[in-house]
UniProtKB/Swiss-Prot annotation:
Record GO biological process: anaerobic cobalamin biosynthetic process; methylation
Binding site for S-adenosyl-L-methionine: 17, 41-45, 62, 91
Record's protein name: Probable cobalt-precorrin-6B C(15)-methyltransferase (decarboxylating)
Gene behind this protein: cbiT
Keyword Cytoplasm applies: no
Subunit structure, interactors included: Homotetramer.
Keywords associated with the record: Cobalamin biosynthesis, Methyltransferase, S-adenosyl-L-methionine, Transferase
Enzyme class: transferase
Any GO molecular function: protein methyltransferase activity
Keyword Transferase set for record: yes
Length: 192
């Protein structure tokens, strides 16, 4: 895992996704060297970079041009990116342009989560995995309900991370925002 402080950051771009969250995302995604993955709402590229070192192809999508630029700089900084396609634009339109996928990570949806998940379902190969990260309660509920409506078994895990900070008299644990991972695998419905 790439430590958080090794990412180039941009004040107008969220991220990077905390290292501990990226670690669990990779465990749930089970990336394989022949997999094709998409990172929707790539931000600074934390998840994109982790996937890039583990899969055949990554499509990184963000509507914010500064996010795409920051992700590109982070890929270059870490010697990754030969297998990454950066796509600036709205996720539903961009998703329609990519091939079928094995892994989908949705870290930002711009209010279009249901449409994004419907398109991902149509693009998901048999045995594919979907992981949605959420900090808002409404997003957690929306993701769970939408994935269930699409025929998936849905799981949710919430991470409450605290990191130690040295003080004169000891170490204080400093909490970060809780992050939920809503995840699933194979759909109950047959893909036509």
């Amino acid at each position: 895992m790439i430590p958080d402080d090794e990412f180039i950051k941009n004040p107008s771009v969220p991220g990077p996704t905390a290292m501990e969250v990226r670690c669990l995302i990779m465990c749930l995604a089970e990336p394989g060297k022949n997999d094709v993955a998409v990172d929707v709402g790539c931000g600074t590229g934390g998840v994109t970079l982790e996937l890039a070192g583990r899969v055949r192809r990554v499509y990184a999508i963000d509507r914010n041009p500064e996010a795409i630029s920051t992700t590109e700089m982070n890929l270059q900084r870490h010697g990754l990116g030969d297998n990454v396609t950066l796509m600036e634009g709205d996720a539903p339109e961009a998703l329609c342009k990519i091939p079928d996928i094995d892994i989908a990570v949705v870290g930002g949806s711009g209010g279009e989560l249901q449409e994004i998940l419907r398109i991902i379902k149509d693009k998901l190969k048999p045995g594919g995995r979907i992981i949605v990260t959420a900090i808002l309660l409404e997003t957690k509920f929306e993701a769970m309900e939408c994935l269930r409506d699409l025929g998936f078994d849905v799981n949710i895990t919430e991470l409450n991370i605290a990191r130690g900070r040295a003080l004169d008299r000891g170490t204080m644990m400093v909490s970060r925002n809780p992050v939920a991972l809503i995840y699933t695998g194979v759909s109950h419905e047959n893909k036509d």
